[in-house]
A protein has these predicted regions:
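Short, acidic/polar
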Residues: 13-27, 186-195, 277-283
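Aromatic/acidic polysaccharide-binding cleft in carbohydrate-active enzymes
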Residues: 257-383, 415
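Carbohydrate-binding surface patches
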Residues: 347-430, 464-466, 471-478
Length: 494
């Protein structure tokens, strides 16, 4: 589940070569199943216009170029159906630098025809069996009135019904849902009541969650935010959303959190810091019982809601920065991608122990110590600065019931100064533009290579290791049977 879905900014950005190159790296080293982004129907995707007589004209060339590239990288679209093509819009209101229109359609019949044509085209190009594995989400955060949607809850529900029925007409087995809400829980409850009362198709409920206690979402990304230190931030929101579904008339619907992160602004330097890695692991581990997926917002800092960014690190959402430098958050997901398929019980909540079919054991361990900026500071000022870790003592790893024999023990780390490109960037003087040599140096300190490797003889089924622990350190300890390790082709470092 943790590697099911990841986010990206907007569809048109996905046509860029550097965006696709970064996603190729993500897929090679992590491997998500789905990707969600804004704006597949935006004017910059050229999907819809009208002739001089008001007759609809459809064009899916940019959509094809994007979706072809995604499928080639073995990642499927989690289709967010936004925003309103200007020729269909009922008003001029837009959001972001790239001007996504946030109004309902002026002609619901023309909107329905567009959705039918879009779905029929996808079915023809990719096959009905393929697109039944996709998800179709209607709109984005319609509960943020006049930010993402100018209508009210009734307007959204009417839009949802129109859209879902149009998709079902062309693809009866396709999966659609909503409301992609930002605020708990008004729209979720209204959505669930409406689809039951009106027999409207829906396969899933979607919502968003961010781990802050202060601030608000503004299109310019200037609001100050403060980390929520509660253990139940993120997961508590998801738990209640699951309970709402269970008590609805459709208790078997899936629950997808199609955006989540530590903060909802692309100017929060916690996103760049090493603390984000342990935050991600802790929140995912707590949320797993409640959700079918949670889509980290986003995989890349190639993200233009506020327009092109002027520095290589600026608190952007991405797992990778503009130049493709891997952040500590990237390695949290990479470590998750190295876990095995069978969970093993652990008595420590800040751990994830697994086994692979070849007998390898993976122990993912972390210290999550939330550090709240002292008032009146916010994440924007506090986490912009270097944040040395504090020594906490020794982490004791003890594994029992292993098969006796020789193992290759490989240890990977994330933390202050370890796979920590942002701290290295600060030590360079935080240049507003980086040279090729500086880029090479930053990539060199964030390659994810093992901290140590050694052979270990397991006797009586036991393995033990003491590891030095600082605040927000992360360890991945992999025990691979020597015969498996020796037979595995070794990859060259990139």
């Amino acid at each position: 589940m943790p590697l099911r879905v990841v986010g990206a900014g907007r569809a048109n950005e996905g046509l860029r070569a550097d965006w696709q190159e970064q996603l190729a790296t993500v897929q090679r080293e992590i491997g998500f199943q789905y990707i969600r982004m804004h704006g597949i129907l935006n004017d910059d995707m050229g999907v819809y216009t009208e002739d001089s007589h008001g007759n609809p004209q459809y064009n899916f060339q940019y959509v094809d170029a994007l979706y072809d590239a995604l499928l080639k990288l073995h990642i499927r679209p989690f289709v967010e159906l936004t925003f309103m093509p200007s020729k269909l819009a009922s008003g001029p209101q837009t959001v972001f630098w790239w001007k996504g229109n946030i109004t309902p359609p002026k002609d619901p019949a023309k909107w329905s025809a567009l959705i039918r044509a879009f779905t029929a085209h996808l079915k023809e190009r990719y096959g009905e069996d393929e697109i039944t594995h996709w998800y179709f989400e209607v709109w984005n955060e319609p509960d943020l009135h006049n930010l993402f949607f100018t209508g009210n809850v009734d307007d959204y529900l009417a839009l949802y019904k129109n859209t879902a029925e149009a998709i079902k007409t062309e693809c009866p087995a396709c999966r659609m849902g909503g409301p992609a809400s930002a605020v708990p829980w008004k729209f979720e409850e209204a959505f669930e009541q409406y689809i039951v009362a009106n027999n409207v198709p829906a396969a899933f409920v979607s919502s968003h969650a961010y781990g802050v206690t202060k601030g608000f979402l503004d299109a310019a990304g200037n609001a100050g935010t403060v980390l929520d230190p509660s253990p139940d931030s993120i997961s508590g929101r998801m738990k209640h959303s699951r309970e709402l579904i269970q008590h609805s008339g459709r208790p078997n619907m899936e629950l997808h959190f199609t955006e989540w992160s530590s903060s909802y602004t692309p100017t929060d330097y916690l996103h760049d810091q090493y603390h984000e890695a342990s935050f991600i692991l802790d929140k995912i581990k707590r949320a797993v019982p409640y959700v079918d997926s949670m889509s980290y917002w986003t995989f890349t800092d190639i993200f233009e809601e506020n327009g092109p960014r002027f520095t290589p690190f600026h608190g952007g959402f991405g797992l990778m920065n503009l130049e493709g430098i891997r952040k500590p958050s990237y390695f949290a997901y990479r470590f998750l991608g190295q876990l095995g398929t069978e969970d093993i019980a652990s008595d420590d909540s800040q751990s994830w122990i697994t086994r692979s079919s070849d007998g390898s054991i993976q122990a993912l361990l972390w210290d999550y110590t939330p550090i709240v900026p002292p008032a009146p500071e916010t994440d924007q000022s506090f986490y912009k600065k270097e944040q040395p870790a504090t020594v906490k003592g020794t982490l004791q790893l003890r594994l029992d019931h292993l098969r006796d024999g020789n193992y290759q023990v490989t240890i990977y780390t994330i933390g202050y100064g370890k796979n920590d490109a942002y701290t290295a960037y600060l030590h360079m003087g935080a240049p507003s533009q980086i040279t090729r040599a500086q880029l090479e140096n930053l990539n060199a300190v964030s390659k994810g290579e093992p901290e140590s490797t050694e052979r270990y003889q397991v006797n009586h089924g036991k393995f033990s290791r003491d590891l030095p622990l600082r605040t927000n350190d992360v360890y991945l300890v992999v025990l691979t049977p020597s015969e498996v390790f020796d037979a595995t082709p070794k990859k060259a470092s990139r």
